[in-house]
Amino acid sequence: MRILHTADWHLGKLFYGNYLTEDQAYVLEQQLLPMIRDEGIDAVVLAGDVYDRSLPPAEAVELFDDVATRITADLHVPFLVISGNHDSPARLSFASRLLAPQGLYMAGELERLTGPVVLEDDAGPVAFLTVPYAEPAVVRQCLGQDEVRSHQQAMEALLGWQGSQVPDGVRTVCVAHAFVAGGVASDSERPLSCLLYTSDAA
């Protein structure tokens, strides 16, 4: 299975007072979509931070809608999307159950997750564990695991919950959006937040 992994599109990014939507549209429409078509991609992954903020401008939402439609409806390629720390999980989850049969798998709110996304190729099933960014308190409440107090414990709980639904021997891909310990700050316009964890479960 040929999987194209992407992340951090940050659609609707405002850079020194200017929206980058036109530039982002060029990259997605003139580079990403032809790559999906020409390279025989079997599945596209967007691992979080679809938008630059939880309430994105309308132009950014329209761009994502257009690109997602072209990937799934025109190119007939499954598109798996999870929310990141910049996204609104509730907004990203909108109509997710309706869209999944069309090949657009949106994982935002934990309450709406039903388990791994399973795709097929000539070698059989591939299970995708879709793990959106979630604070430990949200994971603790949704999974009913009172012991979850840290981001590492939250990730381990989510991976354990989804992974337990995958039969032995099935190829598995983890799609997650999370902080990683040991990050180094750069001269970006916003300070980086380096909080978190490494996990044996990952």
Region annotations inferred by a language model:
Residues Y197-A202:
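Conserved small/polar residues in nucleotide/adenosyl-binding loops
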